[in-house]
Amino acid sequence: LKNVVKSVEPTFFGWFVALISYPPFNSITGSRIPWGANDHVFFWTSTGTTIFHIIIILLLGVYLWATFALGPKASNLTNRGIVTKFPYSIVRHPAYICKNLVWWITLIPVMSWQFALGMGFWSMIYFFRAFTEERHLSQDEEYKKYKKKVKWKFIPKLI
């Protein structure tokens, strides 16, 4: 499998933002910070619902592709090697951006300031996950070359 751990995330903050995203921590946090995203959303009309559901399915498809592309190198807190095939050949964090976009889209029909703040909190967690992962992986020369080739973290030509 060529699944060798090259290095481990060295910072408390890196561990914190990774672990808060998983049970039981995300459930505890989610019970105190409402975020409103859900799997069963209706977008005012059947046409609107269909269009948004197609967008959600496409984003989930890219998310799934990103997950499979990582294969045995998938790890939040260790460097097991750099994955450069699609969709990682387009952006450096395709799973994070797709997951966040799905959450924001499913929030649209029930948007409130409380849910917007909660979703903003979770989006920041994922931004900081990307930040700490990149800081850690940038110790690897192979990742430095990858960053020069794939310039965008989340959305090509934007972020």
Region roles according to the model:
Residues 98-106:
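Hydrophobic, membrane-inserted alpha-helices
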Residues 1-77, 105-139, 145-159:
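Membrane-anchoring alpha-helices and their flanking helix-loop junctions
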Residues 84-85, 89-98:
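Histidine-centered phosphotransfer motif of kinases
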Residues 77-85:
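Juxtamembrane inter-helical linkers in multi-pass membrane proteins
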